[in-house]
């Protein structure tokens, strides 16, 4: 009976740590889940950022890319040392989306409410590319 109980506890701990290793190494794609909706005149981007405050999140335009960065500040981190399992993300996240060179940061509107970053990006008029021809001899 006692031996069986010890084996069950050992199996529980092994499963717990195996699950932790698997989740921490392979589940990063669950971070910053994003939905992008297209409407007639704009795009709506919704990004999950649970646990982040407004001052933790930065949105920028870099060479045609919309860049979203989030970093948990030290104020948000729990300082308890006896965690059995810790799944809430702490640290730095960065994600980028290519928009093109015609966008201005001033045109993009955003808000962060209840762990959701919501961005509104107005569409730019697509100009047909001018064709250039080589003169043949």
Swiss-Prot record:
InterPro entries: A-crystallin/Hsp20_dom, HSP20-like_chaperone, Small_HSP. Keywords: Chaperone. Residues 25-137 form the sHSP domain. Disulfide bonds: none annotated. SUPFAM superfamilies: HSP20-like chaperones. Belongs to the small heat shock protein (HSP20) family. Probable chaperone. This is Probable Hsp20 family chaperone.
């Amino acid at each position: 009976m006692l031996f069986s109980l010890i084996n069950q506890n050992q199996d529980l701990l092994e499963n717990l740590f195996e699950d932790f290793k698997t989740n921490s190494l392979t589940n990063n794609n669950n971070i910053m889940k994003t939905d992008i909706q297209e409407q007639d005149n704009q795009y709506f981007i919704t990004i999950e950022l649970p646990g982040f405050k407004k001052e933790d999140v930065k949105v920028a335009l870099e060479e045609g890319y919309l860049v979203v960065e989030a970093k948990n500040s030290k104020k948000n981190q729990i300082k308890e040392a006896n965690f059995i399992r810790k799944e809430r993300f702490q640290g730095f996240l960065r994600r980028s989306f290519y928009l093109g060179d015609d966008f201005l940061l001033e045109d993009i509107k955003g808000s962060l409410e209840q762990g959701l970053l919501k961005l509104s990006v107005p569409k730019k008029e697509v100009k047909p590319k001018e064709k250039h021809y080589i003169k043949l001899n």
